[in-house]
């Protein structure tokens, strides 16, 4: 997959037009990840080998991008869509409560005072990515999302997890009666 991504990036970057490129890796997916012929088997558990291999591949891919002429005008966004769902990652289950998805923005050209350990949701990625690309938009955010670069509080920071979850899961009379036309 990485080699295909490199070929595609090389091809579209040669067009000398702005572009967006997305690649999705699923090697670390439940139940035990995918082991290919290049995966080193250093650890007793398959999932540990899979995570080590994917970490190495992504690191090599990012370093390759950094060496390319298009890197100076590029933003790299790495998002973990969710935590690993298996229960075989740690023998000591106490570590499960300390886990979080890995997310990083590389080469944004931006600085902000409050960028670490923010409380945010997936819908905050969209305005953050647009901010990284210097794309302007109205108001303090887009939809429910708030840019993590502005220092303005996200909805999760404003409301707290429980209140936000309750608000998002509540029924909407407008949606039900006006949009779905249900009585």
Predicted feature locations:
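Solvent-exposed soluble domains appended to multi-pass membrane proteins
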Residues: 1-183
């Amino acid at each position: 997959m990485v080699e295909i991504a490199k070929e595609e990036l090389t091809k579209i970057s040669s067009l000398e037009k702005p572009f967006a490129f997305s690649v999705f890796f699923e090697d670390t997916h439940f139940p035990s990840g995918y082991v290919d012929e290049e995966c080193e088997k250093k650890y007793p558990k398959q999932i540990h080998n899979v995570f080590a291999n994917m970490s190495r591949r992504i690191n090599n891919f990012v370093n390759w991008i950094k060496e390319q002429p298009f890197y100076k005008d590029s933003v790299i966004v790495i998002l973990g869509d969710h935590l690993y769902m298996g229960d075989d990652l740690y023998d000591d289950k106490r570590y499960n409560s300390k886990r979080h998805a890995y997310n990083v923005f590389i080469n944004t050209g931006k600085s902000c005072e409050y960028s670490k350990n923010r409380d945010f949701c997936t819908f905050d990625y969209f305005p953050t990515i647009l901010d990284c690309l210097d794309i302007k938009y109205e108001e303090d955010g887009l939809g429910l999302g708030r840019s993590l670069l502005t220092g303005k509080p996200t909805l999760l920071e404003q409301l707290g997890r429980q209140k936000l979850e309750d608000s998002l899961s509540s029924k909407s009379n407008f949606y039900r009666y006006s949009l779905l036309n249900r009585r």
